[in-house]
């Protein structure tokens, strides 16, 4: 049995186990929770520039942040991002494995213990505010501790003390986790003749480093010197996982020695495999519990919208509806960009009325509100929203792209070039920036561009004051200034439908033919049929015919409604089954 145990825990078995865990983490973040990674990629823009680096060099922990931002940019790719995340989540297991070999050679208890930190990191990474820099920080702690215990000679201890200020500068608050871990090791686990002396010196070095950093070298608040960039998220479950991980690492030398002693004489393979399997299984279960399907749908919808894949975004929302404001806002935006707003509005969920068309001004929606204004041709207002977002949150991929696009459309090529230059210093947005730069150098190409040419034709020709407190009031002003702006018109008409203002919506139909419409959009037809049914007077459709499909559908709806209303308790349920995608259902039940 002893030979069997020794064979099981050879290096190749450890590597096999690590590989399995790596692919579990990869599969989870690539196919299940990729929304976590993509969301983080949209929150910051990594720029290859001296200024971007210098901003991180002037504070302890800045280099860990810089490395985290560098790696986060790869989250733009599902596969590359998931590989990066899985690697840094799995790496602590390898570090712990080598640390265990230095602490007590030949003990199999290291097998389950090496999965504790990766399991906790996997659960923590399931929170979409857990940044890559946090994973890097914990890895730095373990790698430096491995360096510290790799040799028992005096020079290694002196090197640890000498390099500790550098560790603090590189990793910030994570260095204090190492200090606690190393103190426990030399005072409680190692317990050599001069342990107290080295422990006292480490405490002294820590104190002196803090004083030098806070009073001489850096202009950071003391609390940042001590804790930055440790994660302190306002989430109880996350804080609990973080606390458990920190305590586990700090006490690890004692935990390992205690368990190694208890495992003497118990060398059966399952004795170590079962706990390891349970730890990994617990990580999977807890990660799945953290998974938020509604958030995942919204972020995936944003991914499609930001990539300009509007038809895919529409189909995605209709198949997997996001029942929150942002999801429905981007669904309506995608409909507007494809000219389907009044034809397909109610095929997706509409739970927020007019609010899902235009987001109100404020910090909550600062990163998303610009898209409505961009869609209807108010490029100055879209520029303002994007600029305010940049001021508040810093460079983000979408605010810099929006600023570049609106500057180009406004003819401010110098400013457009400024934002293009920023994007040229990135990995995933450089190609797009070069395309924009080509149009800056050749403005004639803008007119023929599939996106920008159309947007130029939507820009109002008359000046007016934008009403940002009541943004829906801008739509009539846009239509008056640019009568051919069908996007603004359909936003206006969709707003009337969502607010159930049937009379004005139907009255607007008579103007459609003169604006180039050859047929009445579906949901305006349905509104017209409501008007006709309630008044008995045929509305003026401006010479456009009412489709037979809408008339037949209304007849079926009316017949079903009359039959179903005999049981008021089940009326909505029965009507929703066959008519949830009609304006009539929205009008009667929402």
Where do the language-model regions lie?
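Membrane-interface coil-to-helix junctions
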Residues: 26-80, 86-88
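Transmembrane signal-anchor helices characteristic of membrane glycosylation enzymes that use polyprenol
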Residues: 13-38, 205-213, 281-287
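Internal/C-terminal transmembrane anchor helices
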Residues: 266-292
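Membrane-interface micro-motifs in multi-pass membrane enzymes
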Residues: 57-61, 81, 85, 108-155, ...
